[in-house]
Swiss-Prot record:
Binds up to 2 Zn(2+) ions per subunit. It is not clear if Zn(2+) or Mg(2+) is physiologically important. It is an enzyme of class 3 (hydrolase). PROSITE patterns: UPF0036 (PS01292). Induction: Expressed in cells (at protein level). Probably a monocistronic operon. Its cofactor is Zn(2+). Zn(2+) 1 binds at residues 76, 78, 144, 166. Pfam families: Lactamase_B, RMMBL, RNase_J_b_CASP, RNase_J_C. This is Ribonuclease J 1.
Length: 560
C-alpha cells in the first residue's frame, strides 16, 4: 500500500532497505518525474530464518515507478550494497553506474543469473558527473574495506543530498585516502540532507587503520612454522593484498580455494590492487610439492558458511585440502549479524581437530570498514547538512548517530530517524514525512523468491524445535466406524521405541475423538481432521510440554 503526498517542489528521500537493520541497503532520491536509486543490497538471514539464503527488499515501489527511475548508482562492491541487483534487474532493467571493481563483481553476479547480456552498465570514478533532466550526480572518494568506495552527491533543485555509503577515516590507508578537501568544500557550498553510515555508532573511538592490521598479519605469519589457512571476506581486496605481501615476505606460495575468492583474486590482479611477484599464486595441485612452512591457503568461509571452502576443509569433505597437525587457521574477519553462531561452531570444529585458530577477537587481525563515533562526527562536521538522516544501522545505532548530530549543532527537529518505506519530503527550507509505502522483507530460498512467508517460517521453527506427528486413521463415513488405526508416526518429536506408553495413550485419545466426530451426520474428512488436531495437540502438550506440528491423515476405504 502506498500513501505518499509529495508536492511538486519537494524532493523525496526514502529507503526500501537499510533502516533499522544491517544490510539490504537501497535508498532513493526522487524529484518530479525522476528517481535515482543508490545501492541495491541483500541482508544475510538471522538464525531464526530457517532455510533462507538471503533477504532482499520489496522492489514494488521501484517497479511501480519504473518510468521515473533513471539510474542505479553504486557506492561500493559489498554484498549488502550490490547483492540484490540480480533480483532487482529481474523485475526492472535499470541502468547501473559503478566503479571498476564493483562493476566486475556485479558482472559476476549477473552472469550467474543469465542477466549480463541484457544489463545496461556504465563505469564511473570519483570524477564522473551524471546529468539528468532535473537532477545530476557527482562523487567523492571515501575510505572503506574495499577499493573504490565513493560518496554520492545528488544535486536537486532544492539542494544537495549526500549518501556517504560505508566509510571510515583511515589516515594511513592501504588504498587511496578519503577526499576530505572535497567533503569540506561540499559543506561550505551547502548540503540540504546527509544520509550517513550508522554501523559503528556504538564505538566511541576511531577504528583501527587497515595498515595496522597488515602489520599484525605479517607479525603473526612470521611466527608460524606450519601451513596457514587464511580466511577473509573475498571482497576485502586490501586484506587479501596484505596477506599476499606477508606470504611473499615469509617465503610462502598461495593457493586459493572458493569460487568467490578465486574471482576476487583475479579481479584484484587485473585491476592492479593485488601486486605480487609472478609465481606467488599456485595451482592447488602444486601444494603437494611444498613444505608446510611454504604454504598459505586463502579461502572462503570466514562467516561459517556450511558449503564454503573452510567449512568443508574443517569437516573433512574438501577434495583437495584436509586439516593437518601443525596447521594454523586465521580468521581475518568478524562475524556479521546472523553469522556469529555458525562462526563459533566452525572455530570449535577446527580446534577440536587439534589445529590452532587465530581470530579477530583475540588478535589485532581485523578492523572494521565503518567509522566509529569520532569519524561519524567528523563526517557531520565536514558536510554540515541542514537535515540529517542516519542510515545503515539498527535502530539503536541510528538513535546514537542522531545524538552525535545534535552534539555538533544540528537541531533535533532537523534529524529524521526513519523506517524503510517512509518518505522524507524536503525543500530548501522545510522537511516533513510525506507518507509511507510497503517495504517488507522478501525471502530468497533456493530458486524461490518471495514465496516463503511468515506461516512457512513458523512451521519450520516448530519443526526444528518440536518435530512433527502424523496421525493416520481409516474410517467409513457410511457405517460411522474406524476401520484401521489410529496410528501415530513421529519425526523429531519423540523416539517411538522408547515412548510406547505415550503412543498408546495418544491412540486412545484419538480413537475417542474420531468416534465422537463420526457420530455427527455431517461428518467429513475435514471435520475428522480437525477433531484429531484438537484432541491430540493439548494432550501432547500436557504430557510433554512440547507442541509438534500435527498432520492428520484420514483415509476412506476403496470403493472399487
Amino acid at each position: 500500500m502506498t500513501n505518499i503526498s509529495l508536492k511538486p517542489n519537494e524532493v523525496g528521500v526514502f529507503a526500501i532497505g537499510g533502516l533499522g537493520e544491517i544490510g539490504k541497503n537501497t535508498y532513493g532520491i526522487e524529484y518530479q518525474d525522476e528517481i535515482i536509486i543508490v545501492d541495491a543490497g541483500i541482508k544475510f538471514p538471522e538464525d531464526d530464518l530457517l532455510g533462507i539464503d538471503y533477504v532482499i527488499p520489496d522492489y514494488s515501489y521501484i517497479v511501480d515507478n519504473l518510468d521515473r527511475v533513471k539510474a542505479l548508482v553504486i557506492t561500493h562492491g559489498h554484498e549488502d550494497h550490490i547483492g540484490g541487483i540480480p533480483f532487482l534487474l529481474k523485475q526492472a532493467n535499470i541502468p547501473i553506474y559503478a566503479g571498476p571493481l564493483a562493476l566486475a563483481l556485479i558482472r559476476g553476479k549477473l552472469e550467474e543469473h543469465g542477466l549480463w547480456r541484457e544489463a545496461t552498465v556504465y563505469e564511473i570514478n570519483h570524477n564522473t558527473e551524471l546529468t539528468f533532466k532535473n537532477m545530476s550526480v557527482t562523487f567523492f572518494k571515501t575510505t572503506h574495506s574495499i577499493p573504490e568506495p565513493v560518496g554520492i552527491v545528488i544535486h536537486t533543485p532544492q539542494g544537495k543530498i549526500i549518501c556517504t555509503g560505508d566509510f571510515k577515516f583511515d589516515f594511513t590507508p592501504v588504498g587511496d585516502p578519503a577526499d576530505l578537501q572535497r567533503m569540506a568544500a561540499l559543506g561550505e557550498e551547502g548540503v540540504l540532507c546527509l544520509l550517513s553510515d550508522s554501523t559503528n555508532a556504538e564505538i566511541p573511538t576511531f577504528t583501527n587503520s587497515e595498515k595496522v592490521v597488515g602489520q599484525s598479519i605479517l607479525k603473526i605469519i612470521e611466527g608460524i612454522h606450519g601451513r596457514i589457512i587464511f580466511a577473509s571476506f573475498a571482497s576485502n581486496i586490501y586484506r587479501l593484498q596484505q596477506a599476499a605481501e606477508a606470504a611473499v615476505k615469509t617465503g610462502r606460495k598461495i593457493a586459493v580455494f572458493g569460487r568467490s575468492m578465486e574471482k576476487a583474486i583475479v579481479n584484484g590482479i587485473e585491476l592492479g590492487y593485488i601486486k605480487v611477484p609472478k609465481g606467488t599464486f599456485i595451482e592447488p595441485s602444486e601444494l603437494k610439492n611444498l613444505h608446510a612452512s611454504e604454504v598459505l591457503i586463502m579461502c572462503t568461509g570466514s562467516q561459517g558458511e556450511s558449503m564454503a571452502a573452510l567449512a568443508r576443509i574443517a569437516n573433512g569433505t574438501h577434495r583437495q585440502v584436509t586439516l593437518q597437525p601443525g596447521d594454523t587457521v586465521i580468521f581475518s574477519s568478524s562475524p556479521i549479524p546472523g553469522n556469529t553462531t555458525s562462526v563459533n561452531k566452525l572455530i570449535n570444529t577446527i580446534q577440536e581437530a587439534g589445529v590452532d585458530v587465530i581470530h579477530g577477537k583475540v588478535n589485532n587481525i581485523h578492523t572494521s570498514g565503518h567509522g566509529g563515533q569520532q569519524e561519524q562526527k567528523l563526517m557531520l562536521s565536514l558536510i554540515k547538512p541542514k537535515y540529517f538522516m542516519p542510515v545503515h544501522g539498527e535502530y539503536r545505532m541510528q538513535k546514537i548517530h542522531a545524538g552525535l548530530a545534535m552534539d555538533i549543532g544540528i537541531p533535533k527537529e532537523n534529524i529524521f530517524i526513519m523506517e524503510n518505506g517512509d518518505v522524507l519530503a524536503l525543500t530548501s527550507d522545510s522537511a516533513r514525512i510525506a507518507g509511507h509505502f510497503n517495504a517488507q522483507d522478501i525471502y530468497v530460498d533456493g530458486n524461490g523468491i518471495g514465496d516463503i512467508g511468515a506461516a512457512v517460517l513458523r512451521d519450520r521453527r516448530d519443526l526444528s524445535e518440536d518435530g512433527v506427528v502424523l496421525a493416520v486413521a481409516t474410517v467409513d463415513f457410511n457405517t460411522q466406524m474406524i476401520l484401521a488405526g489410529p496410528d501415530i508416526l513421529s519425526r523429531g518429536f519423540i523416539y517411538m521405541r522408547e515412548s510406547g506408553d505415550l503412543i498408546r495413550e495418544s491412540q486412545r485419545v484419538l480413537f475417542n475423538a474420531i468416534r465422537i466426530a463420526l457420530k455427527n451426520k455431517d461428518a467429513s474428512i475435514q471435520s475428522v481432521n480437525g477433531a484429531i488436531v484438537n484432541a491430540l495437540r493439548p494432550f501432547l502438550y500436557e504430557k510433554t510440554e512440547r507442541e509438534p506440528i500435527i498432520i492428520p491423515m484420514v483415509l476412506t476405504p476403496d470403493k472399487h
